[in-house]
Amino acid sequence: YRHPMEEEDEFGMEVFGDDAPRRSKAKRKKRGPEDSPFSVASLTPIQMPNLDLEAMIDERQYFSRDEWLNMLLRSAGYEPSELSEKERLHFIERMVPLIERNYNLCELGPRGTGKSHIYKEVSPYAILLSGGQTTTANLFGRMNSMRADRVGLVGHWDCVTFDEVAGMRFKDTNAVQIMKDYMASGSYARGRDQINADASMVFEGNINDTVQNVLKTTHLFDPFPPEFNNDSAFFDRIHYYLPGWEIPKMRSSLLTGHYGLITDCLSEFCKEMRRKDFTHHIDRYFRFNSDFNKRDEIAVRKTFSGLAKLLFPDEAMDKDDVRWLLDYAIEGRRRVKEQL
């Protein structure tokens, strides 16, 4: 039995029936499909075949800012009523690498705060590298290769996440330099080839001491391996440092029982919105002063753009909304600068 959905490569729930009356009692040398005692009685789709992005954006006007934010959090499985406004923004920030191209996010903090949940369970376009281990060839492709592996993971995924930065080890001595090139420009050289990709990079890890003690003895990037810790230029390419110690540890009350978007819809929404750029909304009301160098401005703009695409996809933002997101974006970039 072939259902029309099989041609669309979709997922569904099938109910099988026993077609005993259809069985042929005659002995056959070769059995055909008609001899099967089973048939598909019904099929219920459980995955969206496509997303009407404009229709979804149009629905934004019927929600207040907080209602839309809460809907996004519930769609990711979280219960916003258990979170403060700052905590809710932290959880939304975790989604920015999924909706903003070439975005570099670092989140370090205590264990058990659900750092990898978004990238493992919510989006099929993100890959989680367990233990933070990979190779240069796996991440950036093989030199002078004409095969599909020429571009590596950054060319095949929207987001590449290292779930334990302490385990990041590369045998290739040029790996850190290649990663810096990619994080800065979205391109890198492999042999004779110059390759472009738009995957975002997420670096996650654990801080096993209090932040106060860490700052007294070292810095907030300490969990990274020595080959990274000795290179401040690498950290300067990180757009936002998400303070994991400000996020509550996961507990049953943080898991929502309310309705939200199905994950297919949320992930497709993020993927489609990656093509858009909302950075120009900053310039309607604000200008960067001389305290911001070029990398600072790029980092803040990209964080702002990602948050704005998530929370204001219809671009209906007033000055207070822009300032709200801009303040949050600057805070995360300042945390990076203070460690350099």
Q: What feature does the model see in each segment?
A:
Residues 1-75:
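Extended, charged/polar low-complexity intrinsically disordered regions
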Residues 47-51, 157-162, 208-209, 214-217, ...:
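Short acidic (Asp/Glu) and glycine-rich catalytic loops that position anionic groups and cofactors
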Residues 72, 95, 179, 266, ...:
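Short amphipathic C-terminal alpha-helix that caps PH/PH-like domains
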Residues 79-213, 218-222, 236:
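Conserved ASCE/P-loop NTPase catalytic core
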Residues 93-95, 189, 224-229, 252-255, ...:
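Short secondary-structure capping micro-motifs at structural edges
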Residues 172-176, 196-198, 228-235, 259-263, ...:
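Amphipathic alpha-helical transducer elements in NTP-driven molecular machines
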Residues 215-249:
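A short helix-turn-beta junction within AAA+ P-loop NTPase domains corresponding to the substrate/partner-engaging
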Residues 239-340:
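Conserved NTP phosphate-binding and transfer environment spanning the P-loop NTPase/kinase superfamily
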